[in-house]
Amino acid sequence: MNTRQLLSVGIDIGTTTTQVIFSRLELVNRAAVSQVPRYEFIKRDISWQSPVFFTPVDKQGGLKEVELKALILAQYQAAGIAPESVDSGAIIITGESAKTRNARPAVMALSQSLGDFVVASAGPHLESVIAGHGAGAQSLSEQRMCRVLNIDIGGGTSNYALFDAGKVSGTACLNVGGRLLETDAQGRVVYAHQPGQMIIDEVFGSGTDARALAAAQLGQVARRMADLIVEVITGALSPLAQSLMQTGLLPADITPEVITLSGGVGECYRNQPADPFCFSDIGPLLATALHEHPRLREMNVQFPAQTVRATVIGAGAHTLSLSGSTIWLEDVQLPLRNLPVAIPQDDADLVNAWRQALLQLDLDPQTDAYVLALPATLPVRYAALLTVINALTAFVARYPNPHPLLVVAEQDFGKALGMLLRPQLPQLPLAVIDEVVVRAGDYIDIGTPLFGGSVVPVTVKSLAFPS
């Protein structure tokens, strides 16, 4: 059996907390000798987990780069792992941390110092999907062929991911979390973030001083927060819930058969702390309010496989060498790294399907760099090629982008597609790479051409989640 073993690392930098997870991954090529390689994870063993520590931020809300790097390197040392011995990895930055002024450069610098890692600055849609995968909601939905809604409730946001038979059918993000009100050990509010103050104003009246609230009154705030979280599930949103939405709503009239709660508040929902202010916020109070919420008690709430550690545990990577006779490559400057792949869910309307796939990745079709994947079910016929050409030209016309048009296909028709597409888009840098199998959430690197341009190395990187 053709297998590969990797030592990988997953680093999750969130609004409130950061964690590091080392894992040993084993990938197997499931394809026959004559077929396109198709790698799958067969073992995902977590070998070491760091404590969950607070994300270091300064008074202006920026990441403290030096302190963050020192914290992460300390986890390598504690695990007894040298950075150079790690084969692959993923750094995910989420929540309010992703919005800080120095988030992207800080994480890219960290990645370059540690190795060639997948780097994802996750907005609300991608964060929801990552949490749903990490919690095990996606695999539960796939195994049971049912609809599972995971709600990842962290410090600043609640991220919703709806899976239908394993596929993402909706995401949403509500600006409600357990650390919107920071407290001291006695439950006195020391700081109210703006969304938290908005909730206080609705419950107690505009202009209420959060620092004057008693512990019992914080319970009222937590109950209103629980109401808001449930409103997003039911689709009946109050004006306050509407104002706190960071995204669109979940699909209407679709009832999840199972609900799972992950994140720090999800962990408190599972294991309620004796001290409600042990984390110096109202996360435990919010978990209690969710436990007692009458509408939520009517729903099928189950504990997920992971709660506070619902995140990536690393990234699997495998490299393919592709024959230049089957690809089209013109005016594209290589190498290109960490390109997210947009995989369409609807073969009938590729333009809209690509747009939806990019939305799930929190990517802007007109500014970000990405790869458009063709449907794996597409037949190798001339009529199918014409359909793809029409879709690609329509997509480029609707979403002009300064980056090259990059297309990846499982089928063996890259050269033909490129030759037919080039007259339609004569000025656009273009790459069509075929015989590559990709899945939702994958990233690819396209290396510098080898052997006089006859071979292009392509590395497919898949995020790894707890099994």
Curated annotation (Swiss-Prot):
**Residue span of the signal peptide, if any?**
none
Q: In which pathway does it act?
A: Amine and polyamine degradation; ethanolamine degradation
- Output the InterPro entries linked to this UniProt entry: ATPase_NBD (IPR043129), EutA (IPR009377), FtsA/MreB (IPR050696)
- Kindly list the places in or outside the cell where this protein is found, as annotated in its UniProt entry: Bacterial microcompartment
List the effects observed when the gene is inactivated. Can use ethanolamine (EA) as a nitrogen source when AdoCbl but not cyano-B12 or hydroxy-B12 is provided; cannot use EA as a carbon source. Required for aerobic growth on ethanolamine supplemented with cobalamin (vitamin B12). A non-polar deletion mutant does not grow on EA between pH 5.5 and pH 8.5.
Sorted keywords for this record are: Bacterial microcompartment, Chaperone, Virulence
Q: What induces it?
A: Part of the 17-gene eut operon transcribed from a single promoter, induced by ethanolamine and adenosylcobalamin (AdoCbl, vitamin B12).
Output the Gene Ontology cellular-component terms: bacterial microcompartment
Q: Name any Gene Ontology BP term.
A: ethanolamine catabolic process
The record's comment on protein family reads: Belongs to the EutA family.
Q: What does this protein do?
A: Reactivates suicidally inhibited ethanolamine ammonia-lyase (EAL), cyanocobalamin-inactivated EAL and O(2)-inactivated EAL; requires Mg(2+), ATP and adenosylcobalamin. Reactivation probably occurs by the ATP-dependent exchange of cobalamin. Protects EAL from inhibition by CN-B12, does not have adenosylation activity. Expression of the eut operon allows this bacteria to use ethanolamine as a carbon, nitrogen and energy source. It relies on cobalamin (vitamin B12) both as a cofactor for the ethanolamine ammonia-lyase (EAL) activity and to induce the operon. EA enhances bacterial survival in macrophages in a concentration-dependent manner, suggesting it is an important nutrient during infection.
Descriptive protein name: Ethanolamine ammonia-lyase reactivase EutA
Q: What is the species listed in this Swiss-Prot or TrEMBL entry?
A: Salmonella typhimurium (strain LT2 / SGSC1412 / ATCC 700720)
Q: In the record, what lineage is assigned to the organism producing the protein?
A: Bacteria, Pseudomonadati, Pseudomonadota, Gammaproteobacteria, Enterobacterales
